[in-house]
Amino acid sequence: MIDNKHQIPREHGQAGEKLAMNYLAERGLNFVEANVRYKFGEIDLIMKDGKEWIFIEVKYRSKAQYGGALNALSPAQIGRLRRAAEHYIQIHKIDAVCRFDLIAIDASQIHWLPNAF
């Protein structure tokens, strides 16, 4: 028996990440990597704006219920993303300005918050 209960949210997340990547690329950012996973956290997108590295969390909600995508990021998730980014910076020996952005997608609305946290 195949368990599909997590398949639909994962597909929505991947679709949201693709939308976010295209949205940011249209605004001049350069794609580096997606879905970087470590045991202690995950980075949805890594992009660059000139020499600046951008670690991006993507939140997708098909409906704006419960505060929508803009309010879907918890302090614990921020901590995990920061740890993952610090690890990525260390193993890739990055010595550059970095920032953390949030892309929040509610149905068809895309909100980009540079330096979100």
Curated annotation (Swiss-Prot):
The species this protein was found in: Shewanella woodyi (strain ATCC 51908 / MS32)
Record-stated family: Belongs to the UPF0102 family.
Protein origin, superkingdom: Bacteria
InterPro entries noted in UniProt: Restrct_endonuc-II-like, tRNA_endonuc-like_dom_sf, UPF0102_YraN-like
Protein name: UPF0102 protein Swoo_0351
One Pfam family per UniProt: UPF0102
Lineage of the species this protein comes from: Bacteria, Pseudomonadati, Pseudomonadota, Gammaproteobacteria, Alteromonadales
GO molecular function terms listed in the Swiss-Prot or TrEMBL record: nucleic acid binding
Gene3D superfamilies with a match to the protein in the record: 3.40.1350.10
